């Protein structure tokens, strides 16, 4: 069964030009909430966020829907560059 981090990695790496440079980490925030941190190279940031943030919004929607199926109440997604 695919976990939240693996699912997020699958989605983001399928978008990126260089999938080996993508890192995904998960942190507990509260009892029922998690923080997913997606770390991408600077040159991939525009591709991951998309025009007007549409790709980032779609990623957030898919990840939150997946988390809901795993009985997680709230998931926050951060996208950072290095």
Regions found by a protein language model. Name each.
Residues 1-47, 55-82:
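RNA-contacting regions in translation and RNA-metabolism proteins
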